[in-house]
Swiss-Prot record:
GO biological process, one term: double-strand break repair
Gene Ontology terms: cellular component: cytoplasm
InterPro entries, A to Z: DNA-binding_RecF, DNA-binding_RecF_CS, P-loop_NTPase, RecF/RecN/SMC_N, RecF_2
Chief location category: cytoplasm
Subcellular location: Cytoplasm
Protein name: DNA replication and repair protein RecF
Function comment: The RecF protein is involved in DNA metabolism; it is required for DNA replication and normal SOS inducibility. RecF binds preferentially to single-stranded, linear DNA. It also seems to bind ATP.
Gene designation per UniProt: recF
UniProt record similarity statement: Belongs to the RecF family.
Organism lineage: Bacteria, Bacillati, Cyanobacteriota, Cyanophyceae, Synechococcales
Length: 364
């Protein structure tokens, strides 16, 4: 890794299935895990602008890793000219072709806002689940975001005639309906698969006192069974019906960007009625369910990134999380100290301290 965040140069060889990154806040622990997440999914849960990921005095940042059976993945972030992705030294025409060999699931303190935060946080969480199961999903999301930008720009272009705008919107509606349908179906399918596993974890975490329901509420009216053609036609019609409202507000009123994922405990919205402890248990259960589902469907466990999350959990939940990870998952864990990690965990871990993490700093 070169020029990424506050890391000038960092080279690591993982010799154990567990890497414990220990050090004070601000030393770059989260940045290391973020780099791994970015290489595996092309996304960062902390930042949406690549320029913020590049060290301030360098023109580019580089992340490279050897994974699996010798696959070399490389992602270069440039201030000018965007990104370049390489696999085994070959420049890829599409960055998306980098997704797949490095499946990873992240769990950080930021995820604790999943229950009480805005709907966008739950959409982003579900999108990360779908992406692990179907890497092609990244292309669908890129197309959706591009279409939304184009529609928004179209409403601001006052110089074109109403006839031209109508023709362009008709074309956009067809594309938007197709992409939206495919995203809706994948999100719904993933949540349906995830729900029974999450319910089992919630029962375990609550001592059998709480029931969990996950409801997918699409930002389009979708009646009947999961079927692409009826849903596509329904979304096209809704887009036409909402045009006046869309023009007035300047934003598209129909589509996956308006989805909500409802989390219910005992039949009541956990966001409104769940205690802080219940919400944390729910997030933990969702993450453990995600880990189990991806392992089950992909045939091998993903890399687990635990970013300073243990400090946010009580000792009981800490222990449950560490036990659930077990010996079958490779994981990178950041923390300010080793407390909470049992002797067995430390014995099977490679421990990276502040000196190794930031060799460019003089640490007394």
């Amino acid at each position: 890794m070169q020029g990424f965040r506050n890391h000038t140069v960092l080279q690591l060889e993982l010799t154990q299935p567990r890497l414990l990154v220990i050090g004070p806040n601000g030393i770059g622990k989260s940045n290391l895990l973020e780099a791994v997440e970015l290489l595996g999914s092309l996304r960062s849960h902390r930042c949406s602008n690549d320029r913020d990921l590049i060290q301030w005095d360098t023109p580019q940042a580089l992340i490279r890793a050897d994974v699996g059976d010798g696959d070399r993945l490389e992602l270069e972030l440039r201030r000018q000219g965007g990104r370049q992705a390489r696999r085994n030294g070959k420049l890829l025409d599409r960055q998306l072709d980098l997704i797949g060999p490095l499946r990873c699931i992240g769990f950080s303190a930021l995820d604790l806002d999943l229950v009480r935060g805005e709907p966008a946080l739950r959409r982003q969480w579900l999108d990360r689940v779908v992406l692990q199961l179907e890497p092609v999903y990244a292309d669908l999301m890129a197309r959706l975001n591009r279409l939304l930008r184009q529609r928004s720009q179209l409403w601001r272009q006052r110089q074109i005639s109403s006839g031209e705008r109508h023709a362009l919107l008709e074309a956009f509606d067809v594309q938007m309906a197709l992409v939206s349908t495919r995203i809706h179906r994948r999100r719904q399918r993933a949540l349906h698969r995830l729900e029974p596993i999450a319910q089992r974890w919630q029962t375990h975490l609550s001592g059998g006192t709480e029931t969990l329901e996950l409801h997918y509420k699409p930002g389009s009216r979708l009646d009947g069974e999961d079927a692409e053609e009826p849903w596509r036609l329904a979304i096209e019609e809704q887009l036409r019906q909402q045009r006046e409202e869309e023009e007035r507000l300047g934003s598209c009123r129909v589509g996956p960007h308006r989805d909500e994922i409802a989390l219910l405990l005992g039949g009541s919205p956990a966001r409104r009625f769940g205690s802080a402890g219940q919400q944390r248990s729910l997030v933990l259960g969702l993450k453990l369910a995600e880990l189990e589902l991806v392992t089950q469907l992909c045939g091998e466990p993903p890399l687990l990134l635990l970013d300073d999350v243990l400090a946010e959990l009580d000792p009981t939940r800490q222990q449950l999380l560490l036990e659930a990870v077990g010996e079958s998952h490779q994981c990178l864990v950041s923390a300010t100290h080793l407390e909470g990690f049992g002797g067995g965990w430390q014995q099977q871990a490679q421990i990276l301290g502040a000196r190794e993490l930031r060799p460019d700093l003089k640490i007394g």
